[in-house]
Amino acid sequence: MRVLSLFLKDFRNYTDLRLELGPEMNSIFGLNAQGKTNLLEALYILSLGRSFRTSRLTDAIRFGASHFFIEAVFSHKEVFHTLSIQVDKKGKKILFDGAPITKLSELVGLFPVILFSIKDIAIIEGSPSERRRFLDLLLAQASDKYTEHISLYHKALDQRNASIKAQNQKAISAWNSPLIAYGSLVAFLRNECTKKLNTIFQTLWDNTLKETLSLRYESSLITEESPTLNDIASNYYEQLRIANTKDLDLGYTMVGPHRDELLLTINDLPVAKFSSEGQKHSLLAVLRFAECVYLQEEFCIHPLLCMDDIHACLDQQRLDQLLQLSNSLGQVVTTSTICPDHRSTTSCIFHVTQAQVSLVAPQSL
């Protein structure tokens, strides 16, 4: 995928903006609070239908305006597409090539964006649900079927938990079948994704830094290195049977992919406890790069990589190493308060001041 242009109307501090992006590195710099991150937020909203900065999209409507409008023109496999979203107090309207999209599950994957920001620290320092969400978003960008599978799993889980609270053993048993079917598939896909991501991650990490890094999916349903889907389903059935009495006592389902964990270690030690802030941010940046490579190698999907406030997250040495890696990832958009010095014939540099974006280099696109 290549993003050709981005149009903003009454979004954050932008009244009216049309921005043309270069095919590879796009570096956006300017002082704080000028609108740099707003550009990445707009791209992210187009990708997932939600913001990484607020839970309410109406917060992004420019002060005094009634709605905001975002539109991107992009190419995928040499076919041009238009994706837009309009948000007002009544809700949002999403159009893909003029046709309405009514479900976010239909949107995810159409305009793939991988975002690296300082808020990614939650993947390391947050609860296991943050790491499960990381895997789920990656898999959802790869396949809309995954979104359907995990949605059906959570529906079955909610129904089973309601049956547990009602102490209805017949209903509990009835919901075990869909729970096992969808839950086993979710655990299987997450595990396979993690193994492939780990291989890519280690390769990228070895090219930049010397520490030993590892990603591992930890699940009570997975008891061997390369389980089949049937192996996981059999384990799930047995564990639900064993945990039935305890589930009734506690009032909820104890086992399943909703309890799983993605373990991140560096030199065989937990990253969250034994890594410096610099190591954590470097790890997260490489993890985002690994996502891009995973989507490219496994699904022939070329996402847009967005990196926010890179000089605040990374020291210059680590940043230089990572930017060298980014050259092979396709289209990239970065923001910083510092004017970049990685100028080349394939990079575009933009300056932002008071919601005005000007092209610094090259002179024209």
Swiss-Prot record:
Keyword NADP carried by entry: no
Binding locations of ATP: G30, L31, N32, A33, Q34, G35, K36, T37
One GO CC term, this protein: cytoplasm
PROSITE patterns hit by this protein: RECF_1 (PS00617), RECF_2 (PS00618)
The keyword Repeat belongs to this UniProt entry's keyword annotation: no
GO molecular function, one term: ATP binding
Function: The RecF protein is involved in DNA metabolism; it is required for DNA replication and normal SOS inducibility. RecF binds preferentially to single-stranded, linear DNA. It also seems to bind ATP.
Keywords: ATP-binding, Cytoplasm, DNA damage, DNA repair, DNA replication, DNA-binding, Nucleotide-binding, SOS response
Gene Ontology biological process terms, A to Z: DNA replication; DNA synthesis involved in DNA repair; double-strand break repair; SOS response
InterPro entries in UniProt: DNA-binding_RecF (IPR001238), DNA-binding_RecF_CS (IPR018078), P-loop_NTPase (IPR027417), RecF/RecN/SMC_N (IPR003395), RecF_2 (IPR042174)
Name of this protein: DNA replication and repair protein RecF
Family assignment from sequence similarity: Belongs to the RecF family.
Main localization of the protein described in the UniProt heading: cytoplasm
NCBIfam families from the UniProt entry: recf (TIGR00611)
Gene that encodes it: recF
Subcellular location: Cytoplasm
HAMAP family for the chain: RecF
Matches recorded under Pfam families: SMC_N
